[in-house]
Amino acid sequence: MIVGVILFGGKGTRFSKDFPKQFLKFNGKALMEHTVEKFLLDCFEFLVVVSNKDYINKSIEILKKFEKKIYVIEGGKTREHSTFNAIKFLENKIDLEDIVLIHDGARPFVNKDIIEKNIENAKLFGATVTAISSENTIAVVENDFILSVPKRDSIFIIQTPQTFKYKVLKDSFFKFSNRLDNFTDDSSVVLASGYKVSITEGNKKNIKITTVEDLHLMGVDEIVGG
């Protein structure tokens, strides 16, 4: 079985003080709709949408038009706590060998090819993350001074989806359940648990929408508030 988890747990304060970015409308639909539509694929048994508790009802209202089975659950105080909530929600619904794909709700431009390659690599390796190679030289800095400059061919920019066998996620997140504030993405929790994580090639268009300017860069002109 394959399930998709889409994270909309934050309030998007960098985007707008008035409403979360998932409800911003462009090209006639809310950002949430654009993202979820990418996962209305036959391979997914069901989807889990993780929402800020204040917007669960609004999320349900937006998503009820889709025929796919979609559960809307409450998110946590951070991204990783939201992922952990989804992992616990899935405990009695799927088996340990099943595949769980986790995606940032603010990445509406993900495509089917990336999703399918994630699933394929998770089946092969147990854990995989979407990433693109860095075109820029990256420096490690401390106190405003450069400590080192890693080789560019070893630097990758992490995106989502991040996809795992359920047993890998469950083992990793329960192991670090009291230290999830130390992590910023799912793969770092899995790595800390001793698992290897493979790379699935992403693309530049699979950006995370953080500001209105990000949508303009993607060629979106008509943007309407939530």
Curated annotation (Swiss-Prot):
Catalytic reactions of this protein: 2-C-methyl-D-erythritol 4-phosphate + CTP + H(+) = 4-CDP-2-C-methyl-D-erythritol + diphosphate
Keyword Nucleotidyltransferase among record annotations: yes
Record-annotated site: Transition state stabilizer: 14, 21
Domain of life: Bacteria
Listed InterPro entries: IspD, IspD/TarI, IspD/TarI_cytidylyltransf_bact, ISPD_synthase_CS, Nucleotide-diphossugar_trans
Cystine pairings recorded for this chain: none
Annotated site residue numbers, Positions MEP for the nucleophilic attack: 152, 208
EC number(s) reported in the record: 2.7.7.60
Pathway note: Isoprenoid biosynthesis; isopentenyl diphosphate biosynthesis via DXP pathway; isopentenyl diphosphate from 1-deoxy-D-xylulose 5-phosphate: step 2/6
Enzyme class name: transferase
Keywords of the record: Isoprene biosynthesis, Nucleotidyltransferase, Transferase
Gene Ontology biological process terms from the UniProt entry: isopentenyl diphosphate biosynthetic process, methylerythritol 4-phosphate pathway
Transferase recorded as keyword: yes
Pfam families recorded: IspD
A GO molecular function held by the record: 2-C-methyl-D-erythritol 4-phosphate cytidylyltransferase activity
Annotated transmembrane regions: none
Sections of the chain in a coiled coil: none
Family statement: Belongs to the IspD/TarI cytidylyltransferase family. IspD subfamily.
Annotated function: Catalyzes the formation of 4-diphosphocytidyl-2-C-methyl-D-erythritol from CTP and 2-C-methyl-D-erythritol 4-phosphate (MEP).
Protein name (record): 2-C-methyl-D-erythritol 4-phosphate cytidylyltransferase
Organism: Thermosipho africanus (strain TCF52B)
Taxonomic classification: Bacteria, Thermotogati, Thermotogota, Thermotogae, Thermotogales
